Amino acid sequence: MVKYALLPLVAVSLVQAGGPEWHHSRTADFAVDPKVHKGCTSWINVVDASGKLTCDAFLDTINVAKRQFIFWNPQLNSDCSNIQSKASYCAFLPSHVSKQTRGQMDPPPKTKPLPPGLFNDWGNNHAQKRNDPPPKTKPLPPGLFNDWGNNGARKRDGLSPTGGLGDFHGPKEAPPPDWGHKGVVEGNHGNTMSTRSPIMGTGLPEQQSEPAFMPPHIPNLPNGMENKMVVHATTLTKKLRPTGSYVKRDANAPAPTPGSVGVAIVGCKQYHTVKAKDTCFNIAQQYPGLLFSDFLRLNPPPSNLDTVCSNLKANTRVCVKGDTKTNLVPTPSAAVGVHARDVQGWPSPTKPGTNPGCKSFELVKKGDSCEGVARKHHISVAQLKQWNPAVGPTCEKLEIGYYACVRV
């Protein structure tokens, strides 16, 4: 139904020299075709239709769609090109009048009246006497009841010996009118488990409880980390710190000496000597508060560890405490490692070089620009470039479908 604010109903006249002439008013000033819907409260009065006048000339003025205008004026053709001079056309039909009129256009199908004393039984599609007794049905044997869902009868105590109420079926819906004519079936219908309520006759399904939340699976974790980290789906921007609750710190680790194997790190305050089975992850977990990304910053390549921590060797020293800002190096997103990004809850994909301490991301969509993304998150374009160096100095490499860091 067309909804619009009706223009002030004063006569609106549009006259062109030697062209069509029409005006808009509350009354029909000319002849009205019998096919026009009754109840119109606004009219287009065409004085002169010369020059191939169509309804497109005044539809914008009355704010009505062409198909709606033709519906109100059925004498018009599909392209509304047969407008006549000295004729009035309906320009507005109130909603209640339109509904009544459409109802008159499509009358309900005529049905043959039933003889007196009969009524129509819609369920069986035939007429019955109103005072007829219900059809006789064969009584059920003792211990059986009618199962609407399976359209048959079964034993009342036909429960699974191990499933409790697993085989109990309540009614799925109200019994059909001819349920009494269905056959009687005795026996078990199978071991299908059912959670439907055992209360008979309610016809209401039992409310299903939501399954318990299962944390997402983190593939290819290093040894000793299976099923120990919990990543919640709603905390993608939260960085999780290793707690060290299930890994004991090596209190007897030998202090570094000038003769130890490894390269000294400027500003390092504490070292860890790598053992045969150590990994970068379990080393970081032995020191509460030490993030994996900070561990990589404290041991920058090429002197100690590479960007994915694949060259960790036994009997070498790695730094586990120091000023991460002093040893901050440009670290690509791969430096955080696939496992670290999964544990931190980073979305995917991200560009190489994304700030490893990022806490919030924005998915780049079609039409986005660095200025628009920065303005949306109340940061400067310079900060956006600093946290996402892969976008380039002029943001020419801001690619659709990648996540950009917008908060650290």
Curated annotation (Swiss-Prot):
It comes from the Eukaryota. Its main location: secreted. Residues 98-178 are annotated as: Disordered. Keywords: Chitin-binding, Repeat, Secreted, Signal, Virulence. Residues 42-91, 270-320, 360-406 form the LysM domain. Pfam families: LysM. Residues 106-116 have a biased composition (Pro residues). InterPro entries: LysM1-like, LysM_dom, LysM_dom_sf. GO terms for molecular function: chitin binding. Residues 1-17 form the signal peptide. The keyword Cell division does not apply. GO terms for cellular component: extracellular region. It is found in: Secreted. Might have a role in sequestration of chitin oligosaccharides (breakdown products of fungal cell walls that are released during invasion and act as triggers of host immunity) to dampen host defense. The LysM domains bind chitin and potentially related carbohydrates, and might be involved in damping host defense. This is LysM domain-containing protein ARB_01488. It comes from Arthroderma benhamiae (strain ATCC MYA-4681 / CBS 112371) (Trichophyton mentagrophytes). The lineage of its organism: Eukaryota, Fungi, Dikarya, Ascomycota, Pezizomycotina.
